[in-house]
């Protein structure tokens, strides 16, 4: 899982 902004 990867979360970026």
UniProtKB/Swiss-Prot annotation:
UniProt entry tagged with the keyword Secreted: yes
Where it sits in the cell: the answer is: Secreted
Modification Sulfotyrosine, positions: 1, 3
Q: Name one GO cellular component term.
A: extracellular region
Source organism superkingdom: Eukaryota
Instruction: Cite the entry's keywords alphabetically.
Output: Growth factor, Secreted, Sulfation
GO molecular function: any one? Answer: growth factor activity
Write out the PTM section of this UniProt entry.
Sulfation is important for activity and for the binding to a putative membrane receptor.
Q: Which family does it belong to?
A: Belongs to the phytosulfokine family.
Cited function: In presence of 2,4-D, stimulates proliferation of the cells, but does not stimulate differentiation into the somatic embryos.
Q: What is this protein called?
A: Phytosulfokine-alpha
Q: Which organism is it from?
A: Daucus carota (Wild carrot)
């Amino acid at each position: 899982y990867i979360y970026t902004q």
